[in-house]
Amino acid sequence: MSKRPGDLACDLERSLPALASLGTSLSHSQSLSSHFIPPPLEKRRAISDVRRTFCLFVTFDLLFISLLWIIELNTNTGIRKNLEQEVIHYSFQSSFFDIFVLAFFRFSGLLLGYAVLRLQHWWVIAVTTLVSSAFLIVKVILSELLSKGAFGYLLPIVSFVLAWLETWFLDFKVLPQEAEEERWYLAAQAAVARGPLLFSGALSEGQFYSPPESFAGSDNESDEEVTGKKSFSAQEREYIRQGKEATAVVDQILAQEENWKFERSNEYGDTVYTIEVPFHGKTFILKTFLPCPAELVYQEVILQPERMVLWNKTVTACQILQRVEDNTLVSYDVSSGAAGGVVSPRDFVNVRRIERRRDRYLSSGIATTHCSKPPTHKYVRGENGPGGFIVLKSANNPRVCTFVWILNTDLKGRLPRYLIHQSLGATMFEFAFHLRQRVGELGARA
């Protein structure tokens, strides 16, 4: 009589230590799990990073004009007398006070429109720039500022340039980038609306591929003995070093399971955690129970990546570029586009180290470079942080195992970070779903 899923999960929890693994990259699923539905509009971040930078620049405009005006006031006759002359006895022809007021007008109008009201239209800055430009041109023509020396030239020019820089920044940076983020958000919502777990293909743009029978790291064989069997070039030694460092980071994450932060779980018992890794940032961890022998997952996910392409349609190409030694290799992977074309295809070059230990199978890796696959204009080159896949054997039942995927990836490009984080967990759930389907099919054939 078979055990209930809950009982199997309990058996697994009693038998498994801290786990980890490296997922080399993100290839967004065409459908997001309902457990990671993007937040509603009212709960999204109030102001984007690029808009906040724009508001800081507007503040700089006011402060810089104010500083120049104060310097101009602080002449031989004293700042108090000059301030009285320019403000109380204001004269359009000779006073700089109106240029300061103009800067304050831009500051208040732009912050009201784009920080307080968070408008997504250019009409506010069109008004402020038009008023500023017209006023400054008229003032330069009709006033006597040019007879006042350097500041007669400097203040109008600086004010004019800053006004147009603000226009350029909003029109070419803020609004286009926020529109792209909005497309991301709507694409994610549309994907969720189509229903979770209905597409063919899981995620993982940079899956760890290693040739069959090329595992190493047995309990009785040291790294020095393995590497001592062959003379390596400087580049090959660097690949081996990178692979060992990635494995060391994975082992450190394993030792800190109590510090994993719970994020989400689903009805299958899959759980996503996060942890902050020094120098590498936020790392996502998927832990899932599989009702199959660990060796089956080891073969499908780690040793035979070509099989993964059959059931993971988001990976369009995978190639082993170089086999450095038995347990170190360099791979090249290409992911398909996702989210209705919002995310363009990414390619990845990874160095991977594969080890077989008493209680687990481990594939760890990190981004690297290779002379045969330089970055091209065809794809955006993504970059993976250290992590890996781990297949954990059960001490009590050889017919079950636990699969753990640690994912630390940078997709590059102008992608909103908060939305990437929202979709990463959903992507990991999708991968677990299709992996479970795959091992179920293989088990039925056996």
From Swiss-Prot:
Major location (coarse): membrane
Parts forming coiled coils: none
Cytoplasmic side: 1-52, 117-121, 171-446
Residues covered by the MENTAL domain: 47-218
One GO process term, biological-process aspect: cholesterol transport
Location of Phosphoserine modifications: 210, 218, 222
Cross-referenced InterPro entries: MENTAL, StAR-like, STARD3, STARD3_MLN64_C, START-like_dom_sf, START_lipid-bd_dom
START domain residues: 231-444
Gene3D superfamilies: 3.30.530.20
GO molecular function: cholesterol binding; cholesterol transfer activity; protein homodimerization activity
Membrane topology designation: Multi-pass membrane protein
A GO cellular component entry from the record: nucleoplasm
Keyword match Transport: yes
UniProt xrefs under SUPFAM superfamilies: Bet v1-like
Entry comment on modification after translation: Phosphorylation at Ser-210 is necessary and sufficient for the direct interaction of the phosphorylated FFAT motif with the MSP domain of MOSPD2, VAPA and VAPB and allows the tethering of two membranes that participates in the formation of ER-endosome contacts. Phosphorylation of the FFAT motif leads to conformation changes. Additional phosphorylations around the core FFAT motif (QFYSPPE) are not essential but strengthen the interaction with MOSPD2, VAPA and VAPB.
Topology Extracellular: residue spans: 74-95, 143-149
Catalytic reactions of this protein: cholesterol(in) = cholesterol(out)
Keyword Transmembrane: yes
Recorded superkingdom: Eukaryota
Function description: Sterol-binding protein that mediates cholesterol transport from the endoplasmic reticulum to endosomes. The sterol transport mechanism is triggered by phosphorylation of FFAT motif that leads to membrane tethering between the endoplasmic reticulum and late endosomes via interaction with VAPA and VAPB. Acts as a lipid transfer protein that redirects sterol to the endosome at the expense of the cell membrane and favors membrane formation inside endosomes. May also mediate cholesterol transport between other membranes, such as mitochondria membrane or cell membrane.
Domains as described in the record: The FFAT motif mediates interaction with VAPA, VAPB and MOSPD2.
Subunit structure: Homodimer. Interacts (via the MENTAL domain) with STARD3NL. Interacts (via phosphorylated FFAT motif) with VAPA (via MSP domain). Interacts (via phosphorylated FFAT motif) with VAPB (via MSP domain). Interacts (via phosphorylated FFAT motif) with MOSPD2 (via MSP domain); this interaction allows enrichment of MOSPD2 around endosomes.
Designated name of the protein: StAR-related lipid transfer protein 3
Species annotation: Mus musculus (Mouse)
